[in-house]
A protein has these predicted regions:
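Secretory targeting and sorting signals
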Residues: 1-21
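Conserved serine DD-peptidase/penicillin-binding transpeptidase domain
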Residues: 20-30, 36, 40-42, 91-363, ...
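A short, well-structured edge-of-sheet supersecondary motif
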Residues: 42-68
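Short beta-strand scaffold segments in enzyme catalytic cores
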Residues: 54-56, 100-102, 447
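Residue-level preference for non-acidic, small/hydrophobic
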Residues: 62, 81-88, 151, 183, ...
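Small-residue-rich helix-loop
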Residues: 65-67, 330-520
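Short active-site loop at a secondary-structure junction
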Residues: 67-87, 92
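A short glycine/serine-rich beta->alpha loop
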Residues: 69-74, 264, 373-376
Length: 520
């Protein structure tokens, strides 16, 4: 290993090709004891042959307190959501709401609408089946009994590109990789838009189980090849949507007497899904549509007959950030594009995200933003860039709502602790550290805010790539070490025992966010 130190900057540059462990390049920290403690964490053998970057700064001044490879570009996974959410709060505002309308070009006369009925999406990723039922009820209350025309689903607020750049094709069936549409349905109050829940109930041994969709829809086709096994037998049930198809295959065995099995699957055409759910709601209200269900644009002369507004953006941030919801991120990106340029595309929206980051001092020439959620393998950030954003965000008028929406370490409440609810429990970081997680195969990240033992507010970012065994517990060790650090006594902070953290923590799947597996 060759090492060079520049006298002017104190930068330590290590030959990356020959380093036996994670490469080292760092500036002198304000507290050598803190440097030693963090260096000990990063000496874990799981970092051997991997890439790891750590930045620690004062949250108010931006002063660098620890740096390791902070200019190294790495895939950030869901840490990308920090940039997307901050740009959305700045451009759209915390009070922004998404609106879904029902319109017609003809008035209601004698209970009839003698024109097409238009269901116009405004990009709301939180629309539930009950919200579509409410729209139908509004029409009923307005006297609508019959539509002499078609039901037209309008998703033109966004473009028709369904998936972002460099998303893995084999993720397509899984609900964290759903299609983005301006008109969609969420099947639950996690607001997993563009997905449906497949519920499988066991029958008697040897019989087929009962399979149902929530909400009920014809947007996907169930192929039930499963069987009911004997009571107490192994559950080998598998639910998977066929690639590039609307067919969902249910196979394997579910034991008799078992509880209902739930699996979330993506829907290939969320616009058709929304139209189907709304058409069912109309029928439930006794409203007849004489024509067909199709897709199209709403004429400018159409008048609003019913409307639904989403929660405010500041409220949406909670399920979005706590549960690391990819579809919320992509809906926000396309909304940024639509509001700024009239084109709801990734290209237009990501330009707004980059512009916000650049305005806040992030060098956007050395990073790459390819989507809003971090699911793209093309995304590249540095911990310098993340730390720059975290320091800048603290000065924003909307900061408190954004900060509160970040997962909080060790807090067991699902919509408080989020993806950190089972991490750093009963430590100095518990209910102290607010951070955004990130997880994909051979990618893990944690960035956010924590106060040390003296009450000094810190920002930190740790991103690791290309490891074989997950070093996620070392992120927790960093968070706890920072929370325990005191400058007053001059002693080294006690380095958190990552082995103890691993024993006491259920991290869930190593390759995805725990919320994506409904494990947190």
């Amino acid at each position: 290993v060759t090492t060079a130190v520049t006298a002017t900057s104190g930068l330590v540059a290590t030959n990356l090709t020959t380093a036996p462990a994670a490469q080292v390049a760092q500036t002198q920290a304000a507290d050598p004891a803190l440097t030693l403690a963090i260096d000990t964490i990063l000496a874990d053998p799981r970092f051997t042959g991997s890439m790891v970057s750590v930045a620690v700064r004062d949250a108010n001044t931006g002063e660098a307190l620890y740096e390791r490879n902070t200019g190294q570009r790495l895939n950030p996974a869901s840490n990308m959501k920090l940039f997307t959410s901050a740009a959305a709060m700045d451009a759209l505002g915390p009070d922004h709401r998404f609106t879904t309308d029902v319109l017609a070009t003809a008035p209601v006369v004698g209970g009839k609408v003698r024109s097409d009925l238009f269901l116009r999406g405004g990009g709301d990723p939180t629309m539930l089946a009950e919200d579509y039922r409410d729209l139908a009820a509004q029409l009923k209350a307005a006297g609508v009994q019959r539509v002499d025309g078609n039901l037209v689903a309008d998703d033109s607020y966004f473009d028709d590109v369904p998936l972002a750049t460099a998303w893995s094709w084999d993720d397509e069936p899984y609900y964290y990789s759903a299609v983005t549409s301006a008109l969609t349905v969420a099947p639950d109050t996690d607001y997993d838009s563009g997905t449906a829940i497949v519920e499988t109930s066991p029958g008697s041994p040897g019989a087929k189980p009962t399979v149902a969709l929530q909400p009920a829809t014809d947007a996907v086709t169930i192929v039930n090849n499963a069987t009911t096994g004997a009571a107490g037998s192994a559950n080998t049930l598998s639910v998977e949507r066929e690639h590039a198809s609307d067919k969902v295959f249910v196979t394997g065995s579910i034991p008799a007497g078992a509880s209902i099995n739930q699996e979330w699957v993506t829907v290939p055409d969320p616009t058709t899904y929304a139209a189907d759910v709304f058409a069912r709601a109309l029928r439930a209200q006794g409203i007849t549509v004489s024509g067909a269900v199709r897709e199209g644009a709403t004429p400018g002369a159409a008048k609003v007959l019913a409307s639904h507004d989403s929660m405010a953006l500041s409220g949406l941030l909670v399920p979005f950030m706590k549960l690391s919801n990819n579809m919320h991120a992509e809906a926000l990106v396309k909304t940024l594009g639509a509001e700024a340029t009239g084109t709801g595309s990734w290209q237009a929206g990501l330009a707004q995200v980059r512009a916000y980051a650049q305005e806040k001092g992030v060098d956007t020439n050395v990073i790459r933003i390819s989507d809003g959620s971090g699911l793209s393998r093309f995304d590249l950030l540095t911990t310098d860039a993340v730390a720059d954003l975290l320091v800048a965000a603290k000065q924003e008028p909307w900061f408190q709502a954004w900060y509160d929406a970040l997962p909080i370490a060790g807090n067991a409440d699902r919509f408080t602790g989020g993806t950190l609810r089972s991490r750093m429990r009963n430590t100095a970081a518990t209910d102290n550290l607010h951070g955004k997680t990130g997880s994909m195969t051979s990618v893990t990240a944690l960035s956010g805010y924590v106060s040390n033992a003296d009450g000094r507010e810190l920002v930190f970012s740790m991103i690791s790539n290309n490891y074989l065994a997950s070093p996620r517990s070392q992120e927790d060790a960093l968070g706890v070490t920072l929370a325990q650090w005191s400058e007053a006594d001059g002693a080294a902070p006690p380095t958190a025992d990552s082995r103890s953290l691993r024993r006491s923590t259920d991290y869930g799947p190593a390759d995805i966010e725990c919320s994506w597996a409904k494990a947190c």
